[in-house]
Amino acid sequence: MKARSPQTTIKPDYRQFRLCKLNTLEFSHIKLLLFWPAFGLAFLALERFRLHAAYHVMHCALDDVIPFSEWALIPYLLWFVYLIGALTYTFFRNVPAFRRMMRFVIVTYTAATVVYFIYPTQQLLRPEAFAHDNALTRAVAWFYTFDTNTNVCPSLHVIGSAAAL
C-alpha cells in the first residue's frame, strides 16, 4: 500500500476525532493550532512585560497627513474575521491549504516576534483626545486599553493578510 503524503487531500471526519488519533494523517494538522496559544503567550510577554524597553518610533511623512477616523475600527475588526474565517474554512474544507497557511503563519509570526524582542518598535499616531464622542470612538478608546501601539513593524496584519490569500 502506498503511503500518503501530508499534501494528499484527505477530508477529515472530525466527528471521529479522538486524542489518540492526533498523530494520524487524517488529524495531524490539528496540532498546528497549538501555535496560537504559544504565540499569544509570547506576544503577551512582549506587550506586558517589556514596559521599559527602548522602542524605535516608526514614522514617515505620510503619517502626518492621514487623519484619525474612528470608522477605521470597522475594517480593523473585519481583518480578524477575515483571518479567522480563512483559517476556519481551510481547516474544515481544504486541509492541505490549512497546512500551508499555518506553516506560513508559524514561520512569519515567529520571525516577527523575534524581531520585536530584538528591535521593539512603536507608532505614536494615536490622538490625545477624540474629536467626536460616539460609539466608535468609545470602542476605539476601549481597544487602546489593551491593544498597544507597540510591536508594529513588521506588521502582523500584513503578514496575516498575505497568509489568508
Describe each region flagged by the PLM.
Residues 50-63, 91-165:
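Membrane-interface loops
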Residues 2-83, 128-131, 140:
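N-terminal transmembrane-helix/juxtamembrane module of multi-pass inner/ER membrane proteins
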Residues 42-45, 85-92, 115:
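Residue-level signal for alpha-helical transmembrane segments in multi-pass membrane proteins
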